[in-house]
Amino acid sequence: MKISRKTTLLAGFLLGLILPLAAQVRTTREEYIDRYKSIAIAQMERYGIPASITLAQGILESDCGNSLLSMRSNNHFGIKCKRDWTGEKVYHDDDAKGECFRAYPTVEASYHDHAEFLDKQPRYDSLFAYASDDYKSWARGLKAAGYATAPDYAQRLIRIIEESQLFLLDRPDGEALYARRYGLPRDPEEWFSSQTSV
């Protein structure tokens, strides 16, 4: 089957129009948080993993759901296959070329598996000694346990949490606090001290 030059030019022209539009439809951090905060809170209530940590990892690992890996596989946490994984797989270049990553039918399944992964892997056991509102210890503990290879992984998580005030979600009334966060102190230390003085 021979493809005409006109067809090729038309296809190229259409791709030239569509691709820039698709690139502009990126999920923002705020949209990502609004979309997944309830799931992160539910995982915190079930497993004790701070919602702020879960969301910050999802934001960082998936680029707010915009990364190729997250779009192809719904994997928002960069969890690799390893030997015990029996689910769907996708191959993606990361630290090495063509690494095996877990694939999920939905983003919600990725969030659930992330909590199960941390809960069941012995190397993360020490994290569960931290309170579910101690996001700094959780961030440092994830890095120390080898969750990511980036040397500044803990600092990046903490920065995301503090910039977006995700620490509010770790509180018992977190969703309500987060909804009215614009009137609250941005600095976590200032916010926590204002709560204890009431």
Label each region the model flagged:
Residues 11-20:
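Bacterial N-terminal signal peptides
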Residues 2-4, 21-197:
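Catalytic cores of secreted/periplasmic lytic hydrolases that degrade extracellular macromolecules
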